[in-house]
Amino acid sequence: MNKGSTVELAIAVHKAGGYPSLCSWTYNGRSEHMQRDLDHFVKATGSNRIHLSFELHEYTNAEVYNIVKSHMIPTIEIIYGDKNTFRPTNSEQDLTVDVIGLLKPIKDLGTKVFKRIYDNVDQTMMDQHLIDGFCIKGSESAGFTGHVSVREVFLQQKAMTPGAMLIPYGGVGTAEQVKEYIDLGAETVAVGTVLALSAESPLSTETKLAAIKKQSKDLTQFTHVVGNVERKQNALQFEPYQGPDDANGTIGLLRGMRGKSDGHVYLGKGIDHVTKIQSCKQIIQRLTQCL
């Protein structure tokens, strides 16, 4: 979740045996703040095993490269395409040039590169854009997402690019679901909504308790137009925030996270599987018990 991906939560997930992440969207374009938190994570855990996500053009290529190289990060995720927030795609040729310019030096470090997708990508584009795998969002996912189920996109992507590493993002909250995806060949399984409601997440206790009382049928689907493309967002809406905001609903999100009466938080169908606030250790133990 934008703003929910904090170094404190990442450390807790790592200590619980999970594979944590940090998202550049948390840092308001300040790459030095992301570097600071990454340094803190590595010092606190003694590990560089963390997944970093960036939106194309959000930072300079050099800034992204230096962050990844500083601790030889094993995996990164790039968010780009016709839904790119920071610069709508002018042409596929321009996009390819930009992606290769960013990713070629990073790939040379040995880092595996994932692309966030809402729709399937063919083998030609995967190879052309130097992609190793895909982080797959669908109708069950939190925040910006697609209309087709995660499982359907996952299975289609597996058939189209059998050598790709795949990470499903959305709707997972039980040990049986985790095992099913692992058995289907998932590299790992994301459980962002469940961890967003963990004891260690930055959401206020008031927000967590309010969310636990809800189910996925209570989620709202916002729509935004970015770069002439309409996108939807799955969110738990409190009283609507009426003030100025950006395309990602960041101010409303911060109010929702802090327990204000107006605002929202980005949650997915995984909310159906959260009935109480638990530690990351308890959550990960529960979700991996069938493996």
Which stretches of residues belong to each language-model region?
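Active-site entrance/lid segments in N-terminal catalytic domains of soluble metabolic enzymes
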Residues: 1-165
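Gly/Ser-rich catalytic serine loop of serine hydrolases
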Residues: 2, 169-174
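Active-site glycine- and acidic-residue-rich loops that bind
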Residues: 110-119, 171-172, 215, 230
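Conserved active-site-proximal phosphate/metal-binding subdomains
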Residues: 141, 149-165, 173-291
